[in-house]
């Protein structure tokens, strides 16, 4: 620049010279000068051009050097080269940036996207920026992710914008490099800061460089200017040290534990469009709030500084007495330590304006990070002064003046400036006060640039740090009285007013100080004490400002009493500075806590003193006088605490010389000492624990190991070890206890098992003896009834004893008689005849006699037999018919070992299929064979064809809670009554009960028969019969039982019984046959004690009617009934017979039992349980002699014998020794009878089936002939359509040609009529299969004849097609479509008329057994003639299967060689046009699969497009595995389904898996035949072409839904295992027609359970198969599955 300037001056001078010389010289001289000037001008111009070239080249070189310096860091760190020379393009994909930050901090970026797409690069840049934030960069220091985008292809973007964006990236790299330099864990290459000088500015670069290498002096604090985000301790110090790093400065390295170069204000200036000045790019160092200042105190303790005078900031010779603004101050060129500068100061200014005060925003964001600065030594802190400053202005960041204002550091009293001045007010004092206050002014001026909120925030932060109770040690209030210090009255101090003393300065009284209090208090003020002291101070200021009572310590020599009012000691002891709040932690300063008057303390602290203090109020005349309390000279006995305590009691008089104890005795003082010692120990332990906790867990804990002694650590370790040992021992004890309990339980179990085994052996012995002793000749049941009636007519009232309670004695003589047994049986007989109206094949006379049998058995056999021969006739009763198979089956279950018992589900699901009795049963062969029944009652060889309504469903027996509680309470009441009467009775376990929830059929009027029952009995009749009934009831035994009757709620039906009111109570007058009352075992003459827990008094008919009406509304009636006579045993029973109203001509037969209350028929009516041995006990003599403990023992043994309490049949009574009178089954005779009955059943079913077949065949022939007649009119149209179905022509009969053509036409019209097609699909599958007789002609002859007919028909049709095609080309397609629509409607109506859907529930199970057809064949329409071709042999195998492969090769060849005609080509063209406009739906969505359900499939004829297909599958071949017959995958010799019952084979066994029973084929060598076909045909994958010319089963296009959901005798088939679904819990998907056992509801790929709670409801269905979500996704994505 100087050269250029010289050239310009020289040129100007030359032109001036030329002007002058032009006037003064000659022409020659002028020419010379002109040439010289021109040459000089040329030289200047060339110099200017050369300068521009050199400058631009230098700029290029400088920019290249900068870029190389910026890129060298990336290259050195990542060890990778830039892909291009362009800096931006190399960083655009973000890979280098991610590699760079991963090198600086390994693992911060887990995954880098190395794709070449722009999105991948943007993703990497975003990840890089997030990692920078994790390292510690602020958001303002990061560039935008779009700054690296390529802007060269944008016309509107200028080069300056591109440079600005690159500059932002470089700024981020710069701060990242600085972070790397300050990271102690990073030992790689560092950033070249000189390369960024042009970018950042030389001033900031120089300042940052200086801050990186801080000079150090000998007094080093031991800490370095390092950045370490993960480590809390400090590392190696830097190499240099400067004056501002001294320990007395707030900016020192000791006080600020870390220096951070990060800030909210960063190098973002260039992005906003202005150049980034160093002010906005600079950040000053913040103190770390989490670091402790232990090192600061440690260093200050080692190197104490001499105390500077407190008034060093007052005006003197070198300082002006008034404030002078900084610009007007005198410049001082000499720089000494007092005038040092710090670049890190936010308010530092220089003449060149390098730094400014724009850093104010940092205060608001980071001021909370400033730590609490604590003064620690007597030395005052040094105040930094600015350059050229005559008067000191403290800096709030680095200066310690603020700390000195708040700290308890007290200057030496000897250095007080006004110690020897006269104590009077002078103008100098006023001037001093003004000057002193002006020294505070600059401290507040520093805040002028801040907002009010930031100022309050800063002050709040300082005050919180100082007054925070968390960083201070807690004071124990019980550690005794605190030191009472003198109150300093500063009102006389010059420069102070009373208002200045808001917080009184507390100074220790050296004479009265208590070192123990200072030790235990650790110099912290108790908040309670501080509050109380403030009240105490304000209270005392009102009286007088002079301390009144002073306790003096004894001195040798003469006693000196100072004049308190005249003496200047208090004034001389004024501290120079105000102590706002005393800070803790000074090791050499002890400022005791002020302790006020005891009565000013809060009550919770006063309560902890041992001595009660009373406030002594001095008299008014003595209030102005001062007291001087002189202690004793006997210092050995003197106690400062005692003197302090006694000082409140002492008067104004001088105490005697000798020391006398005050109100506290010696015991109190000893107790005080003990309390002090305990408090001191507790306080020490608490401190130790808090320090350890802060050391281990806290961020604020001390980092010095000197705070925790090795002894404390060892004690803590020992405590932890002891705690661990305690826990370990407790665990061992618990484990040992558990083992002992387990061993005891095993012992008890073994003893119970042995007892049970003995009891079983005893029972078997008893049964054998009972069978051997039965020698009485057998009688028929009818003869026994007649004998019993004759005996009843001749016999008088028997003398029977009755066991009754005390309340019944008063009512004995008042009970009128009820009906006799014969009358009751007659009434029940009449009701039975009225109720039985349904026709049956059983003769009606049996039903009329059965009512007598039913009632008389229950009354007659219950009476005690008069002869011992009758008592010992169990063998003859083996021929009796049983209604109580429920009890007998449970007795079988109870007497068996547990391994032989059937579960509840087996007993319930055994109802599904009948089983013959010729096969052996698993279990004990000596026991009778278990049997069940399906549609008829099968007991003892008799058949009852009762067709139950489908809503009579057996539910799982479960007692209602209120019923079970009621039964238990009743039984307990009866036991208590028995013990009071000293009559020992043995209550049997609760009788079996079950609840059947179903709707009952209404068979009776909606009237209450209880009121009409009152009119049935005449007065004379009551008078005649009542004495007899009264006597009989009085001498009878009775039993109390509870009967629960359920029926459909809301129906106005009575429960089927009538009552009669009597003086003793309410009695049952009659029971209607077939009513719920009969099924609930209610009998005539039963006394009704209560209904629904409501008792009724005599003739309380209104309440009775209300209760009955309420019971009818709810459908639930609970009656407490008392039954008299031998039939009633002294036991409390519970009957829950939830009965339906059944209409039958013949009810189930009865088996005679000795105790009717035990022959309860609960759920056997519905669930048809297994028959078994009738095993009961009626020996009352032995029961009466048993004790309560024996009862409990029997109950316990019965519980373990039955296994669990949740079985269908609860506990049963244990037989006793005296049981020869029991009725026992004759097992062999019963087995023979059951076999005969089974054969009879088979014969009846066969006859019924034959009749049904004949009807179906006739109907089928009529429908076929009608359909052929209707379709003959439209033969021409059908032949044209048949030309497109050439492959199906060889597989059809000639008689069916027109029928199939109609279906083909229908499929075309369904494209236009989608709604009608859906209706046809729903209607077609409802047709049932019709079977052919075995006497038809052989199948092979039919096949040969059919093939010949097809060949002839084919030739004729081809000729007709050629003729028809020429004629049809002239017609419009619209007319044809209209005619076809009419044909379709008429045909569908005719077909539907001749169709009769056969209900699957009406077809017996043996239909499948006698015929060899698959059950799926029944789903076909009867309108097809395919089933005519079936012929089965005796074994059920299809003979047609042997002829499958007999098709000649010529026939198959002829199918391939068929050439489509012109009409077919035209049809294909039309379909192609329609396909273009119609989107194809080749998906397998569930909506399209709904048409594949079992009841919504049309008959799938091969080769013909189904209505449901429409245009979806036009291109798919017609003969692939879509239409593959399911039997191709089956064994040839086994055609019947595994679920079809074939009685020629051994019966399948009932297998229980997970408490669910299903059928399993007995021949283990033969797999289930249809299972494989179902699973393979549903995958939708073409495996093999069908070799058969015909299809005789549902096509595979239905996805196997018909096979899996076919009904076998009304039972569904599991879609997974192909077994009968049964009556257990199942998973059914109605929309798709899928049914599964719970254990079969699993994924077909991985076979994981889909019904469990772990997998939830994640079920996917594809091709009618279940998948879990994972397998389905793999299946969709094409990845291999477990299959």
UniProtKB/Swiss-Prot annotation:
Residues 819-828, 859-875, 1282-1293, 1430-1451, 1481-1494, 1516-1542, 1573-1590 have a biased composition (Polar residues). Residues 312-343, 749-901, 947-1037, 1255-1604 are annotated as: Disordered. Residues 749-791, 842-858, 1255-1276, 1308-1351, 1358-1388, 1396-1408 have a biased composition (Basic and acidic residues). Residues 961-973, 986-1012, 1591-1601 have a biased composition (Low complexity). There is a cross-link at residue 1405 (Glycyl lysine isopeptide (Lys-Gly) (interchain with G-Cter in SUMO2)). InterPro entries: CH_dom, CH_dom_sf, DUF4757, LMO-7, PDZ, PDZ_sf, SM22_calponin, Znf_LIM. This is LIM domain only protein 7. It comes from Homo sapiens.
